[in-house]
Amino acid sequence: MEPVYATGKMVSENNPQQRVMPTLRITSYARSKAFYVEGLGFQIDWEHRFKPNFPVFMQVSREGLAFFLSEHTGDCSVGGLVHLYVPDVDAWYAEFQRRGVSVQEPPNQSLQGLRDMTIVDPDGNKLRVCTRLDDWKR
């Protein structure tokens, strides 16, 4: 059987602000898809598997932010951390509350000049959603 190759454009190619594509390790495609797509409102841009029923490697994105999710054990370990800089962390928080997403730490002001919140995915990866205080609508 021929390998299945990914198609679609890399979101970071269109976003000069983003030059690095982090990868988070996941252990269950179904659980992660439910969390990231249905819970957090990301879209799946593309998926790649070498064969059917093999581990997935995929890109998710939302509002110009993108990262990879991988079931491949050799790519990285669970328990990673990514920072997502957004214009209004409070709007994202309100949306996550409506969607029933459990937020580990609600938005608060940090010592780094940010207003941020922390979400933990089903595999223990942390997503820190941040707004720079200079950009925050007070």
Regions found by a protein language model. Give the residues of each.
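N-terminal beta-strand motif that seeds the catalytic metal site of vicinal oxygen chelate
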Residues: 2-33, 80-82, 131-138
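Vicinal oxygen chelate
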Residues: 18-28, 58-61, 72-99, 115-120
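Conserved active-site tyrosine of GNAT-family acetyltransferases
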Residues: 32-37, 96, 121-124
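A short acidic/small-residue loop/turn micro-motif
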Residues: 52, 75, 110-112, 132-136
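Conserved beta-strand in the GNAT
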Residues: 68-70, 118, 128
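Diglycine-centered glycine-rich loop/turn motifs
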Residues: 106-108
